[in-house]
A protein has these predicted regions:
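Short boundary/hinge segments that flank catalytic cores
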Residues: 1-47, 183-210
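Conserved beta-strand segments that form the floor/walls of ligand-binding pockets within enzyme
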Residues: 40, 115, 152
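Short, well-ordered alpha-helices that flank and scaffold nucleotide-derived cofactor binding pockets
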Residues: 25, 59, 63, 167, ...
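Helical hairpin unit composed of two closely spaced alpha helices linked by a short loop
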Residues: 65-69
């Protein structure tokens, strides 16, 4: 899948769109607890299509009449705003470091009830603010408002904040680039997620990650 394409919105009858509907159904099947609403997407390495995949899944869920919030927590290399063609604006980092209301920084996409929370201003300490009590309180509040909260994050093998987010989430999906990712790295990523006490729901193998 080409980077940056919202295929599930532009081509809802395509094979790829149908694959995302299958992913949605599988996640529903694996989630028996209705209070499990926060799902993290991460990858073994960088450039494996995590942002594009999670954005397409968010669109798929919104088209099924779910109220969805997509959070770009890849604070080092954010991409969600580019996928949805949104201008750089206040977002997650501003919400965590300033006295702002979440409703003032949420972006509506116009696709069903899909909202996005972009990464916000650049910071030097992503792990520190992700570890804050405010981050956890924010996620708890979002669970009372949205049916599903999807979190985009950087690679699990390199960054502490992804391990923290995995622990906060009700389920984690791992992205792997076919022909790009070594099996040893996949095994190590699974081990790191287990150490973070993450609920690993499954793996998505992305055929075209560039």
């Amino acid at each position: 899948m080409k980077k940056g394409n919202l295929i599930t919105h532009a081509y809802p009858d395509s094979i790829i769109a149908d694959e995302f509907r299958t992913i949605r159904s599988n996640m529903k099947f694996l989630t028996n607890n209705p209070n499990h609403r926060i799902f993290l997407f991460t990858s073994v390495g960088s450039g494996e299509g995590t942002s594009t995949a999670i954005s397409n899944l968010a669109v798929t869920m919104a088209k099924q009449n779910e109220k969805v919030l997509l959070i770009d927590a890849n604070l080092r290399s954010p991409a969600v705003q580019s996928v949805f063609k949104k201008e750089k604006s206040l977002g997650l980092t501003n919400l965590l470091t300033k006295d702002l209301t979440w409703s003032s920084v949420i972006n509506q996409t116009g696709i069903g009830e899909l909202d996005i929370l972009t990464s916000g201003s650049s910071i030097f300490n992503p792990a520190e603010i992700v570890e804050s009590a405010k981050m956890q309180e924010l996620l708890k509040e979002f669970k009372t408002i949205y049916d599903v909260i999807l979190i985009d994050s950087p690679t699990i093998l390199k960054y502490t904040e992804t391990r923290l987010l995995a622990n906060y989430s009700d389920g984690v999906v791992l992205l792997v680039g076919r022909g790009k990712t070594d099996l040893e790295d996949v095994i190590e990523a699974k081990r790191v997620l287990e150490l973070a006490k993450a609920n690993v729901m499954g793996v998505i193998i992305n055929e075209k990650y560039k």
